[in-house]
């Protein structure tokens, strides 16, 4: 009886700690089941149980124990249990072999659908929403900001979550606070966590967002309010990984868990639904993929998506082609990043040949909410080559480039990236031509960087933001720049510029004239009208 009670307690304790799904297609559950069958076999199936010590005696001042195998045997129950363990593991191995890429290459290739387009269809980039900062920089900014708040840093630390989201069309990283240690948890868990950190990935500004209702369910809880444990109790058979921390359009905190189903056998998990947990009260709701709320950004995790995109590029012409001739075999480049397009976040990575040479064949964008994957064909330099080119432009400073982001400026593919010093802080920014990667522009701000590129190539950005201006012309001058007549004048001491082609009134402009217009980048007027 004692052994039965011991095993039941042991099963409950290990399940409470490790939380495997009660699902036969989960390797976690298979090992959990086999492990406990082995414990039961030891407790009830061996003739001598676990008492194999014959005698203990002292020799030359040392205690020695001898194993007693006399009379040891495995009874009928033990044999059944050991055979069951062997059978389960053998069946799992056989299923894995039969459903491996050797026999299922076409199925692996078709796990995801990749739509192919030309780069001319690559989304135009809103230059005010390019996430220049990388994750590590955002973490430093968030952690330092929290460190400046003495009333908070004594009780809490920033979680290492820093999920990148698109909020109101702009890229941010968000992370909840967590209890600094078990004592701080004990003192504060009743009232919960009242804030989370939000870092603007464009400007680098950080803020501590106050919550009307504090977070009660988080990854820093120790018992039943731990996020994964709470979800496992409610959904014991569902397969999910670490839920992502997200906020809705009103800034309310949630955890989003993608539910997986193996596509064949024990291989290739694919999302089938989403569970959303309200971090303030523990309420949960499961959504089908078609009904996921629009504020949710991360349904299809980056790592699984990239792995399955590689399946598509590797096995589309069969297993042996992938292993031997490697004709038309492609793979993603080493690294990825995120882009905010509209209200969604997109995974970005490059595509190169299986030989991993110094050129890309194109680029991948995946909508992380809908799972739609598009490949844009374009022969260009790899992201690593672009990084090396940018670092070479400032080699005297020993800056290291962040992983580049591909942007489309007036149908021109460009890599944009930050340049970090030894402390990991972004000091400058670089723009590298994706095709002719020796062409590099470096500046201390993104605005200056884009302005340099626009002036060098005589461009105006389609999505450039403008401001209205009305005033009186003073100190009027003109000059010819790159073949264009440009008028310079001051309004309230500030210099403005306008090209002669903007308005027919400009050749007749005089000091003292009142005008109105729209000011764009670098103080150039996009519209101009004399009143």
Pin down the residues of each PLM region.
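Soluble extracytoplasmic regions of secretory-pathway and membrane proteins
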Residues: 6-531
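Positively charged n-region of N-terminal signal peptides that target proteins for export
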Residues: 1-3
């Amino acid at each position: 009886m004692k052994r039965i009670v011991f095993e039941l307690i042991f099963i409950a304790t290990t399940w409470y700690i490790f939380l495997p799904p009660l699902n036969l297609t989960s390797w976690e559950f298979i090992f959990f089941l086999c492990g406990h069958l082995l414990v039961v076999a030891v407790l009830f199936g061996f003739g001598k149980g676990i008492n194999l010590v014959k005698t203990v005696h002292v020799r030359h001042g040392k205690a020695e124990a001898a194993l007693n195998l006399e009379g040891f045997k495995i009874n009928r129950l033990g044999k059944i249990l050991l055979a069951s363990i062997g059978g389960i593991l053998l069946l799992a191995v056989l299923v894995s072999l039969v459903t491996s890429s050797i026999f299922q290459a076409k199925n692996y290739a078709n796990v995801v659908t990749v739509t192919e387009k030309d780069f001319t269809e690559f989304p135009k980039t809103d230059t005010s929403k390019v996430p220049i900062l990388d994750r590590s920089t955002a973490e430093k900014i968030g952690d330092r900001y929290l460190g400046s708040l003495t009333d908070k840093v004594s009780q809490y630390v920033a979680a290492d979550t820093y999920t990148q989201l698109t909020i109101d069309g702009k890229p941010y990283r968000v992370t909840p606070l967590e209890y600094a240690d078990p004592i701080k948890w004990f003192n504060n868990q009743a009232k919960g966590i009242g804030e989370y950190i939000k870092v603007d990935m464009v400007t680098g500004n950080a803020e501590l967002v106050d919550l009307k209702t504090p977070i009660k369910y988080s990854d820093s809880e120790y018992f039943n309010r731990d996020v994964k444990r709470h979800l496992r109790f409610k959904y014991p058979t569902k397969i999910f990984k670490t839920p992502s921390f997200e906020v809705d359009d009103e800034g309310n905190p949630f955890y989003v868990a993608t539910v997986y189903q193996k596509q064949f056998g024990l291989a290739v998990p694919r999302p089938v639904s989403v569970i959303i947990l309200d971090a303030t009260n523990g309420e949960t709701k499961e959504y089908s993929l078609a009904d996921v709320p629009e504020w949710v950004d991360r349904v299809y995790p980056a790592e699984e998506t990239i792995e399955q995109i590689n399946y598509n590029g590797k096995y589309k012409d069969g297993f042996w082609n992938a292993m031997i001739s490697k004709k038309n075999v492609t793979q993603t480049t080493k690294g990825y990043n995120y882009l905010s397009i509209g209200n969604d976040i997109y995974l970005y990575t490059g595509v190169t040949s299986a030989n991993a040479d110094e050129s890309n064949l194109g680029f991948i964008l995946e909508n992380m909410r809908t799972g739609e994957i598009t490949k844009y064909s374009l022969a260009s330099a790899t992201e690593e080559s672009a990084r090396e080119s940018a670092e070479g432009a400032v080699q005297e400073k020993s800056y290291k480039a962040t992983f580049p982001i591909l942007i489309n400026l007036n149908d021109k593919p460009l890599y944009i990236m930050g340049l970090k010093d030894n402390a990991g802080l972004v000091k400058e920014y670089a723009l590298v031509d994706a095709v002719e990667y020796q062409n590099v522009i470096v500046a201390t701000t993104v605005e200056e960087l884009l302005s340099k590129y626009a002036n060098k190539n005589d461009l105006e950005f389609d999505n450039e933001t403008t401001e209205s201006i009305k005033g009186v012309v003073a100190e009027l001058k003109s000059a010819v720049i790159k073949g264009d007549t440009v008028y310079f004048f001051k309004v309230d001491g500030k210099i403005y510029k306008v090209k002669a082609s903007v308005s027919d009134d400009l050749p007749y402009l005089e000091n003292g004239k009142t005008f109105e217009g729209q000011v764009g980048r670098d103080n150039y007027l996009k519209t101009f009208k004399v009143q």
